[in-house]
């Protein structure tokens, strides 16, 4: 049944049917949440061993460094090496910090704003205007960071291979364009992997701004839930190859590997950037939580062992993602009112409805007790120009709750589409 081709009588019959289904869902008083990519209790239980990874004072010493004490601003050598092995860069290029990669990202932009970067002519706060490129749909918290500094956010359409590089390459001719957000693997929310060609074009860019900042958030670098680990290019060496070693800062964390909010995070950059940034960071901090870094090193051990843990996460996640996609295929695909990308990793399914349906769909879902990411959140300033993108986060609810939530969501999308196409 194609909703766009219904006769008036067919529309009324379908509308009455879907409306009745919606009212029955509302009557159940559900309280379900698909708003954020949180880990389920089952996933958190996988890493309970990290709580007892350190049990004696002797175990707190790592390569001669007592993790209980001050010092080692750039993090424990072993933690830096673990991240370097995962990211494919050098240990000397890694700064291991606290629990939040978002905080490290904010701090990097903040330092550019207040002090300037290595190749800045002046702090960005003294620039007449600062513009920032935002591949969209993208991560709402990225956009909020750059919006909070008053930057002008420019939407860059996403393709199946990553951001539209023709548009990017044209825009960076403007010296006021200072940077770009990226989630290169299993992008949030589309689950797209940047192609090798896209990565090469990004690495070889020649922005007019000498201090252009490529923010490379590799949040889902080892987060496959369908199939084996997919290797990825080391953006640091790619940029260095094209004379852009100082252009990029890469970020990662264990937030969806161990404990969200109690993991460890890092940034990776050129040695020259490392020297510049550690001088600034050394004013605000003496060291980060090395005890937690050491707990993670003891628990995760190395890249191979970490990938084995991610396979255990995948066993929990895959049935949930399969169920979401199967429900969409069964309930929505025949109606011609939405499309989606089926990801093999990451934490989201991105649904693109027919124009003008996202806000209404999510308002109906909220009334029926299903909370989801706000409409528009995946675009700069919270404004989706087509009002069509909806981010589904399947990871937190148990499967039985997720089945209910998806049934409600599909019902709401149908109702919104029928309202829009009223005969």
Residue map of PLM features:
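Walker B catalytic acidic pair
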Residues: 218
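Short amphipathic alpha-helices in soluble, non-transmembrane regions
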Residues: 361-367, 405-410
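Conserved core of the PLP fold type I
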Residues: 59, 65-210, 221-243, 358, ...
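N-terminal "arm"/small-domain region of PLP-dependent enzymes with the aminotransferase-like
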Residues: 2-74, 78-79, 84-85, 367-370
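Conserved PLP-binding active-site segment of the aspartate aminotransferase-like
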Residues: 350-355, 372-414
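Conserved core segment of the aminotransferase class I/II
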Residues: 237-318, 418
């Amino acid at each position: 049944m194609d909703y766009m081709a219904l006769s008036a009588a067919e529309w009324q019959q379908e509308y009455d049917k879907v409306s009745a289904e919606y009212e029955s869902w509302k009557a159940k008083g559900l309280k379900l949440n698909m708003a954020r990519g949180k880990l389920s209790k089952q996933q958190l239980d996988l890493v309970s061993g990290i709580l007892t990874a350190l049990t004696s004072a002797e175990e707190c010493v790592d390569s001669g460094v007592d993790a209980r004490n001050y010092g080692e601003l750039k993090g424990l050598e072993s933690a830096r090496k673990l991240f370097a092995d995962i990211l494919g860069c050098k240990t000397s290029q890694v700064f291991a910090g606290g629990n939040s990669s978002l905080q490290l990202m904010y701090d990097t932009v903040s330092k550019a704003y207040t002090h300037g970067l290595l190749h800045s002519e002046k702090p960005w706060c003294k620039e007449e205007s600062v513009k920032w490129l935002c591949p969209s749909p993208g991560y709402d918290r990225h956009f909020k960071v750059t919006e909070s500094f008053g930057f002008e956010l420019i939407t860059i359409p996403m393709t199946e291979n990553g951001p539209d590089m023709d548009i990017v390459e044209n825009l960076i001719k403007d010296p006021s364009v200072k940077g770009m957000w990226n989630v290169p693997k299993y992008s949030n929310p589309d689950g797209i992997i940047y192609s090798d060609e896209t990565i090469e074009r990004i690495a070889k860019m020649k922005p007019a701004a000498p201090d252009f900042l490529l923010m490379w958030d590799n949040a889902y670098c080892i987060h496959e839930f369908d199939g084996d680990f997919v290797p990825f290019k080391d953006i640091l060496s790619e940029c260095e190859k094209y004379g852009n070693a100082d252009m990029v800062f890469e970020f990662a964390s264990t937030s969806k590997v161990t404990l969200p909010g109690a993991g460890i995070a890092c940034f990776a950059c050129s040695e020259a950037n490392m020297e510049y940034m550690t001088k600034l960071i050394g004013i605000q901090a003496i060291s980060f939580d090395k005890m937690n870094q050491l707990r993670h090193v003891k628990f995760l051990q190395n890249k191979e062992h970490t990938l084995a843990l991610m396979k255990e996460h995948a066993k929990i996640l895959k049935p949930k993602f399969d169920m979401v996609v199967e429900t969409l295929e069964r309930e929505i695909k025949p109606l011609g009112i939405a499309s989606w990308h089926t990801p093999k990793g990451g934490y989201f399914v991105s649904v693109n409805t027919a124009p003008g349906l996202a806000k209404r769909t999510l308002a109906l879902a909220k009334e029926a007790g299903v909370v989801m990411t706000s409409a528009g959140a995946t675009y700069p300033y919270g404004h989706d120009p087509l009002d069509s993108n909806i981010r589904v986060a399947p990871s937190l609810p148990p499967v039985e709750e997720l089945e209910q939530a998806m049934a409600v969501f599909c019902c709401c999308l149908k109702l919104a589409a029928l309202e829009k196409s009223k005969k």
